[in-house]
């Protein structure tokens, strides 16, 4: 059985976002995220996707949203070719689930939109699948994650998006990196 993995960064008071932005700037942590997820599948909610402004390069991007057509309409710069592929017609949700859409032949940016977690099957992908936000997506998918890679930012910050409780479900496997500003920890799900 194949499981998801989660990757996140949170402050001491569990904040992961403020105004749809990351409330700290830690280039070393961004590099860790990039190295870890490169070549993998990344799953994110609509708000997380919109905060990035574009698909993450060299990864397959899966976006969870209850309103896929709205997302497509709001981002014609990203999904323009996607609409063209469907002949400009408004497809039924299940019609565009089965395959990835290559957005640019020169870059390996693949993107898929999911309207339901039920449609997200980790067995469908050969690559590792990382859950990377936001708060609602973590809340729903952490129980299905075998591993959690968590950056703990060693300060409290103001925010409006919080990482869910995970401590009762996960056990610390190893501390990957420890700096004065943050630490990166690998947790394993006790029940998977």
Describe the residue ranges of each PLM region.
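Enzymes that bind and transform nitrogen-containing heteroaromatic metabolites
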Residues: 1-192
């Amino acid at each position: 059985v194949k499981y998801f993995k989660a990757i996140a960064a949170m402050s001491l008071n569990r904040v992961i976002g403020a105004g749809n932005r990351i409330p700290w700037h830690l280039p070393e942590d961004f590099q860790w995220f990039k190295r870890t997820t490169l070549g993998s599948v990344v799953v994110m909610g609509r708000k997380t996707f919109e905060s990035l402004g574009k698909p993450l390069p060299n990864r397959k991007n899966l976006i969870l949203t209850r309103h896929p057509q709205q997302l497509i309409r709001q981002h014609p710069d990203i999904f323009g070719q996607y609409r063209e592929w469907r002949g400009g017609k408004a497809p039924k949700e299940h019609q565009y689930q089965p395959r990835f859409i290559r957005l640019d032949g020169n870059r390996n940016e693949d993107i898929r939109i999911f309207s339901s977690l039920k449609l997200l099957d980790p067995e469908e992908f050969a690559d590792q699948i990382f859950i990377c936000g936001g708060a609602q997506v973590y809340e729903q998918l952490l129980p299905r994650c075998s591993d959690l890679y968590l950056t703990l930012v060693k300060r409290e910050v103001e925010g409006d998006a919080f990482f869910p409780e995970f401590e009762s479900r996960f056990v610390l496997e190893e501390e990957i990196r420890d700096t004065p500003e943050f630490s990166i920890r690998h947790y394993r799900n006790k029940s998977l």
